Amino acid sequence: MDPASGVIVAQTAAGTSVVLGLMRCGRIWLCPVCAATIRHKRAEEITAAVVEWIKRGGTAYLVTFTARHGHTDRLADLMDALQGTRKTPDSPRRPGAYQRLITGGTWAGRRAKDGHRAADREGIRDRIGYVGMIRATEVTVGQINGWHPHIHAIVLVGGRTEGERSAKQIVATFEPTGAALDEWQGHWRSVWTAALRKVNPAFTPDDRHGVDFKRLETERDANDLAEYIAKTQDGKAPALELARADLKTATGGNVAPFELLGRIGDLTGGMTEDDAAGVGSLEWNLSRWHEYERATRGRRAIEWTRYLRQMLGLDGGDTEADDLDLLLAADADGGELRAGVAVTEDGWHAVTRRALDLEATRAAEGKDGNEDPAAVGERVREVLALADAADTVVVLTAGEVAEAYADMLAALAQRREEATARRRREQDDDQDDDADDRQERAARHIARLASGPTSH
């Protein structure tokens, strides 16, 4: 929050309300407020990608990956097994089972000596027309079975591409054969199981539960996906899931991370264990939340494979900076601001201490057709009066509201320019890293040959 100006609670042309002047943490794993907006925007991106792909004639699958787990397993160990370890100054990053899915000669094929892939050496990815995938990681925890991290991925197949890396483009679509799809699904199940077994035999899932495939047949399926991931899971939505892990209520005695946080808040606020939502003692919930914080640090909750966005003609990225961009863009989604009030820093702190911030933003909405600035100001002032802060509200003139909207758009435009430049740098860095990796692999191969037995 800007101490000099406090916040602005404004009504948009669409009748919604926004709060300008607040700092955003952008922590998708840990902040319920930021996560709700980020995941909603991510869900819109995912839906746009799936709809675009199906319109082009491609095919999409929802694939869910799980590992066997028990109450003594650490979340960090399970996340390492699924997603890979995080790079540290002392150790390189180690791939997880997810990364193993799209590596190796069986998957990628073998290149002929002239650098072109020969027809008899194509890999599974060529036969199914693999284009890329979007991965989302979800976590639940229970007192009996412990942590349960799992991955949902939208996999796009049935495409033919040309070019490499940043120049890669989709040039055609086709329907993969049933034999090719069966081969792919069997290969992924085998690779997933073997990769987890290698990390820890206890994580090895059975063939029935480790990897599950669901085909998205039509654009309606994609829209159903959007409907599901944009609202609370209530048992009536389609069995399709990806981005909105923040809204999910776990079942079978398990709880989602934000349910841990909610129970912590209820118990520290004086509610009894019987009355508070969720399970377990305060100590158990605090311990699980702290473990969750440590295990998710530095990881991406939602990630697209490299160059997939550009091949589909979509912008955006997967970093924390991109998440912050989405938060800022969400403020501008409602259109031009038409009414608003300024609230001082002390006034807004009084509102949040009484948990009235949601009521204050609702008071600024104009869905009932009430767009009069004075009326908006009066409704917000009535809410702040409950926190003894009515005198901290100042109704803004039309010119002041327009100036606030212009500042918001200017900040958004600047962030988008910075994001474009940042992604270009990241793309260049990725290509440099690829070249370094190839050199390291070649050096290791030469070293192995040099250290091998000498024939006489």
From Swiss-Prot:
GO biological process: plasmid partitioning
Extent of Acidic residues compositional bias: 428-437
Keywords: Plasmid, Plasmid partition
Biased composition (Basic and acidic residues): 416-427
Span list, region Disordered: 416-456
Its job: Essential for the autonomous replication of the plasmid pIJ101.
Record-stated family: Belongs to the Gram-positive plasmids replication protein type 1 family.
Protein name per its UniProtKB record: Protein rep
The organism of origin for this protein: Streptomyces lividans
Gene: rep
